[in-house]
C-alpha cells in the first residue's frame, strides 16, 4: 500500500498548476503581443466551421460556462496552448481587429459572421463590428477560465496533458500526430540534457 501512495505522490510532484479568470480582451491582447503561442508544433490547426464557432460565441454571450483553456508556461514566461486552440481561435476570429497579429496567427483575414444561432437569432449574419458598442464591450469583458501548467512541471507532462485532453475530440491528422511525437521527442531530449 505504501508503494501506491509513494508512486502517486511522486507523480503529483511533477505537476504544478495555476488558475486564472481572464477577460476575452486580455486573451486577445496576449496573443497579439506574442505572450500566448496559439499554435505550438504539437497542436492542431484551426478547424472549426462557422456554426461551431458561432455556438461558442453565443455561449460566451449568454454566460454559459465553457471549458477552461489549458496553457503551459515556457521558461521565458510566455504561454502555449495545450487545449483550447479551437475555442481561442474562434474568439479571435470573432473579436480581434481585422489587421491584428492574433488574426494573422489563426490565418483568418475575414472576421467570423455569426450563423445558425438558435437562442440569439438577431445576431445571425452579424460580425463583431456590426454589434452595438455596449455588446462589444460586454463580450470583451467576459471572463474565461485559464489553467496554466507552470514551467516547474516536468516537461513530459504537457504532452501527457495534451493527449488526455484531446482524446475524443476532432481526430488529429497523421501530420499532427507526427508533429506531436517529434516535439515530444525534442522535449524529452532537452529534458535529458538539463
Feature roles, as predicted:
Residues 187-194:
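Conserved small/polar residues in nucleotide/adenosyl-binding loops
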Residues 87-88, 194:
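General alpha-helical segment detector with a strong preference for membrane-spanning helices
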Residues 46, 81, 147-151:
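Short, charged/polar micro-motifs that form catalytic or ligand-binding hotspots
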Residues 25, 54, 89, 155-159, ...:
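Non-catalytic, well-ordered alpha-helical scaffold segments
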Residues 88-91, 95, 161-166:
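Short amphipathic C-terminal alpha-helix that caps PH/PH-like domains
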Residues 103-186:
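Internal, well-ordered alpha/beta segment that forms a basic, Gly-enriched binding/recognition surface
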Residues 1-79, 93-111:
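N-terminal leader or domain-start segments enriched in small/polar residues
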Amino acid at each position: 500500500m505504501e508503494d501506491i501512495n509513494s508512486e502517486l505522490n511522486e507523480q503529483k510532484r511533477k505537476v504544478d498548476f495555476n488558475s486564472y479568470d481572464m477577460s476575452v480582451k486580455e486573451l486577445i491582447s496576449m496573443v497579439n503581443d506574442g505572450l500566448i503561442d496559439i499554435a505550438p508544433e504539437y497542436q492542431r490547426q484551426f478547424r472549426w466551421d462557422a456554426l461551431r464557432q458561432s455556438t461558442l460565441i453565443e455561449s460566451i454571450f449568454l454566460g454559459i460556462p465553457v471549458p477552461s483553456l489549458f496553457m503551459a508556461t515556457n521558461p521565458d514566461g510566455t504561454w502555449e496552448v495545450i487545449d483550447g486552440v479551437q475555442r481561442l481561435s474562434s474568439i479571435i476570429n470573432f473579436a480581434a481587429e481585422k489587421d491584428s497579429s492574433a488574426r494573422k496567427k489563426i490565418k483568418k483575414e475575414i472576421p467570423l459572421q455569426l450563423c445558425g444561432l438558435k437562442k440569439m437569432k438577431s445576431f445571425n449574419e452579424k460580425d463583431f463590428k456590426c454589434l452595438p458598442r455596449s455588446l462589444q464591450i460586454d463580450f470583451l469583458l467576459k471572463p474565461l477560465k485559464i489553467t496554466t501548467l507552470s514551467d516547474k512541471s516536468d516537461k513530459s507532462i504537457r504532452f501527457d496533458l495534451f493527449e488526455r485532453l484531446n482524446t475524443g475530440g476532432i481526430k488529429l491528422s497523421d501530420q499532427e500526430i507526427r508533429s506531436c511525437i517529434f516535439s515530444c521527442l525534442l522535449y524529452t531530449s532537452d529534458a535529458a540534457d538539463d
